[in-house]
Structures are given as structure tokens and as C-alpha cells.
């Protein structure tokens, strides 16, 4: 994987600034004295990216893992029903989470990301003249706005009714920050992207900067937000913006020919990658709370228990997020994405391998895309925390399918929509495959095949009003998680608990 962000942390001493960034924002003298140089702001920007990695923060708060087990594509799994109870409950919509039993790290890691992004946005314009070029300063600020939108996007999807602020809070401010309605949060996210991000970031970055936000990532993020909101007034606009990413060669996006290699290490940041979260196997961490980790701690969670591979490709893990039979059966038998996504335990055993079935919610299937592999971790620090697998957050195939959907929903060119849809289908099934006629229903099915176990399916079901049809026990009262009770208590009652809790 690319080590840019990790190496910046080493060069500029990110670990030395972590404690400072966790100090109360009321320490104005410290803040005023600290952010004086370009290196200081580089360090602050790296710190704002860092919560993207915090999958194990406060008892497993991975955006991707939680999203997968909330969907119909995965169970929770683990060793027993008591293994990580907050994850067990988020998968069971008939005995769902409570304000004191949920993956509350989703809240904390996201707001820490917001706080760190706000520091960059506030401090960059205050640097002494001549300290930093205007071009670089503006790029840093735009990146920080992108990150703030990303973190608020997660909070909006998971919690809905959230405190929203653009300047960090002092201890006395916590009771005055507005708690916005979901529609109000949506408007803020679009406004921030339109005014402060899109058009202000580079279209491409050099190899040593992979992991930093680009204009393509910002446009894709806007499209995801608009589609999740089902804002038909903006479908034509995002169709046009996505078309720019598809047709402008300056962005350098394209599908790679072979889907089967997409999740191999050497294809991180390939021409199909729009945005990834970088991880490294060389982080010297034993921090199970997650903040100091530079490796992807989700990977060990996803591995099949008791796995022994005679080919020494895969290694065992902890058996979380077992793939459901429903997902396995949804694929056409000859769709290569099925093999890339799923390890079929019967087939694995027939080839001489071993996998334990003595696990919680055993299904007979595990995820292959992010299964732990031999050589992808190291014994520096805690080996289980140090997997280098990047998360592919946005891929070019998503650009194509979002553009196709937006065209259909805005009355745009059906021919273009068919072309974009067909590119994704044919990459998987071959040029001779008879591609179905594009429709919203076919796009939604294709999204399941293309992005299975990438943290997308659940949100697609919710936004298309299909969650109740595919997820047992789901109804509209389950759209949002409860706000953690600890946060309600800290606010002295200012925060109002979400409806239905």
C-alpha cells in the first residue's frame, strides 16, 4: 500500500500531537502558540485523516463492518453470541440496540474527525504571511472540508439527528450547539461540498500522495449524499458532475479488466480507485482502543475461524461478518465477483483446506475480499492489528452506476445510462454477455453484486425503501441508531434522544 500518510505521521511527529489534539478546545493559549508553521498545519491535516482508520475505536466502530452486518449480506458471527455484544445487537433488528448497548465508537471517532478537520479550517488562514503558499493553504482547507463532510456523512447516516458545528466547541458551548434534523444536515453537507471542496482539489495526485482527497472523490461523495437523500431536484446536476469523471481523461479513471484482482495489494490505488483509506503493516502498535493503529484491524475480524490453507494464501481470523446464503445464492454461478467476494467453506474443504464450523451464526461462507492473507501483516506491534489491506471506499464502477441511476431518475439520456451500466456488467461477465436493459431495479441488483461486503448494501436498501423487504425485523423506526446515552448525559439533557428510543 501507499505509505504517504503514515510516513508524514512519522516525519512530523503525529504521535506527539495526539495528546494536544485531545485537549479541551478552551486551551486557547496552547492553540495560538502551536499552529505557526506549514509543518504544524501538515501535522494537523494528517491528524484529521487519522480517524478514517479507527476501526477498533471504543469497542469496534468500523463504518464498513457495522454497515455489512446491518445488511442482509452478513451476520455478526464471532465465537459466541456474547462475542462483542454491541455488534450482535446491531445485526438483530428484532432485539435491537439500546442507547447503552450499541457501537458508540461510531459517534466518538466521527466527532473527533470533525474536530480535527475544524482545526485545519480555522488555523490555515491564520498562518503568518509567507509561511505557506496560498495554493497549498487553500488545498489544505479544501481537504479538511472534505474530511469534515465525510465524518458528518457517517454521523448523518447512522444517527440522523446530530449536533452540527463548524467551529470547535469549548466546554461551555456544548449546551448551545444546534442538534439538526436529518434534512438540515443534508443541506449543510451539500453546501459545504459545493462552496468549499468541489473545484478546489486536484483531479489527480502523485503516487507519494495517494490517500489524499481529490476532486473526483468530492464529486463522488456528493453523489452518494444526494442519492441517499433521494433528492430528485439534484439528480440532473450530479449526473452531469459524474459524467465529468467518466469522460475527462485528466481524472485517469477506468475499470481494470479483471475484477478478481481488485482487492490484491498491488491493485490498491489502481486506475479504478477514487478514494481509499490507507493502512500499513509497519505500524508499531499494541493499542486495541484503536487510535494509534496504522493497520486495518477489521481484517482479522473477517477471517474464518480455524482456517488452514494448504496453499498458504489465507490465514485464520475471528469469524465475524459471515456471508449469508442469500448473498451467495444471489450471484449468477459464472459471475467472477462471486468467487472474489465469497469463500465457500465446502469448496475450500474439498480442496484440502480446513475451516471450523463451531462459531456463532455459522453460514458456511466467509468474505474473501478482505479475508486475512499470508504476508499482509507483520509482527511489528500486535500482528492482528497490522494488516495492510486498504479499504476501497469509492471505486470507479460506483461512479458509473451512480451516473446511470441519476440519469434515469432525472429523465436524462437512457442510452448513456445503458452504456455506463453495461460497462460494469461486461467487465464482470465478458463482452459477449447479453446485458439486460438498464432500469433502476437492475442497477440496484448490479450494485449488490459489484459492491458486496464493501459496506454499501445496507445503505442502498434503506435509500431505495427495500430494507423492510430484505432484512428481518427492519422497519422505519430502525433507520437511525440511538444517540449514545453517555453523550446525552454529558450534554446535561441538551441533546434529545432519537425517536423510538
Name each model-derived stretch.
Residues 87-94, 325-395:
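Flexible, polar/acidic helix-loop-strand segments at domain edges
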Residues 17-23, 38, 74, 80, ...:
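Long, intrinsically disordered, low-complexity segments
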Residues 141, 148, 222, 229, ...:
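Structural register within alpha-helical repeat arrays
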Residues 1-26:
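Bacterial Sec-dependent N-terminal signal peptides
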Residues 154-158, 163, 228-232, 409-411:
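Short coil/turn linking the two alpha-helices of tandem helical-hairpin repeats
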Residues 18-83, 162, 186, 190, ...:
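An aromatic- and glycine-enriched ligand-binding surface/loop that stacks and positions planar moieties
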Residues 42-46, 50-56, 80-159, 180-187, ...:
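Conserved, well-structured interaction surfaces
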